Amino acid sequence: MATARALLELLRWHRPSGRLILLVPAGWALWLNPQAPPAAPLLGWIVLGGLAVSGAGCIANDLWDRRIDPLVERTRNRPLASGRVGLLTAVILLLACLLLALLVVLALPAPGRGLCLALAVATLPPVLLYPSAKRWFAFPQLVLAFCWGFAVLIPWAAASGSLAGGWPLVLVWFASLAWTFGFDTVYAMSDREDDRRLGVRSSALSLGAVAPAVVAICYGLAAAALAAAAWLQGLGGLGFWLCWAIAAAGMLREALQLGRLDLPRSAYGIHFSRQVQLGALLLGLILARRG
């Protein structure tokens, strides 16, 4: 019988950074929305929905990869790969997460509920199929980035009742895509040797030696797009932009460090955690100005 610890690991809820990296773009959307700051109940529903959807995505990933994960050093101890959770239990938990996500959407404010439901339904195919992309697409991280884009669209629709957000919405959405492609490419860099051996595709393999530079460009574009969205919404001030520049420089520095030849495998996980912190710092700067 699966233990509570194994189920938490299957959902990835035992690692806060993995959940925050989805909730940070949702926060960007909520606090750069014209209706900001969001009401406390809406914020709670968005957090709960984000946990449910990310949990469902992680389970779907492990179901797709249950025969590959035992062959990869980083993933061989995952609950399904190690046999600590059975297939039926994983499927039931996946359905429970999807049901919880549906209930969250139905609890959202009425003006945007129908649109959020449509967006949630549109999210399902890419979220559930993303794990298969590494089998047929050279840049599966683009699929994940597209999935992450809904973490901006759904909160924005829930807060404002529509997607008529103009350039601020477009910029926040683009920032989420660029940031996600960057950090997930780094995540894939730790598995390059195993992926090459197993015939699995990734942007880290496809980009080769230029991967660190591309990641740096993605982070730079994300920081610039968010800055433009903040400026369009009237945020600013010397202290704000100085802190923003420091955070953006930190993101770029972390990316450029990836070009070192002596990096241990653990460095990629550390990079992932630091990106969560830097993305949250950008959100914190927005929060400080929006209240």
Say what each PLM segment does.
Residues A26-G27, G50, L98, L124-V127, ...:
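Residue-level recognition of pore/gate-forming positions within transmembrane alpha-helices
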Residues G50-N61, V127-Y130, A175-T180, Y187, ...:
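Alpha-helical transmembrane segments of multi-pass membrane proteins
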Residues W28-L48, L102-A118, L153-F174, A224-F240, ...:
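Helix-coil boundary and interhelical linker segments in multi-pass alpha-helical membrane proteins
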Residues R5, A228-G291:
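Extended hydrophobic alpha-helices typical of membrane-associated regions
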Residues L20-A29, P79, V143-A159, S206-A209, ...:
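Small-residue-rich segments of transmembrane alpha-helices in multi-pass membrane proteins
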Residues M1-L7, C58, D62-V85, D184-A209, ...:
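Cytosolic, membrane-interface loops and tails of multi-pass inner-membrane proteins
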Residues L8-E9, L48, A56, T75-L171, ...:
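Intramembrane alpha-helical segments
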Residues L48, R66-A120, R197-W244, Q277, ...:
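Multi-pass membrane catalytic core of lipid/isoprenoid biosynthesis enzymes
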